[in-house]
């Protein structure tokens, strides 16, 4: 499990993700020529405010994997 801190809307937020999910998040950031923080910011801006950000990140990664498997 890896814990990272990012700034979202001017507030520091900690996110816990399994190492495998964090590795994939870094991979997608590199492929997209952006930062992990930018991907997390985009996910945060588009999520239901009542949902858990770490869970939303996992779902986003799963959707990316499903896109590439088609």
Predicted feature locations:
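Short Lys/Arg-rich basic patches
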Residues: 1-16
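Membrane-interacting alpha-helical segments
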Residues: 4, 47-48
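Amphipathic, hydrophobic secondary-structure cores in small proteins
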Residues: 14, 20, 31-45
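Amphipathic alpha-helical recognition patches that constitute DNA-binding helices
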Residues: 16, 35, 52, 56
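Aromatic/hydrophobic pocket-lining residues that form π-stacking "cages" and hydrophobic walls in ligand
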Residues: 25
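C-terminal structural segments of small proteins and small subunits
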Residues: 48-70
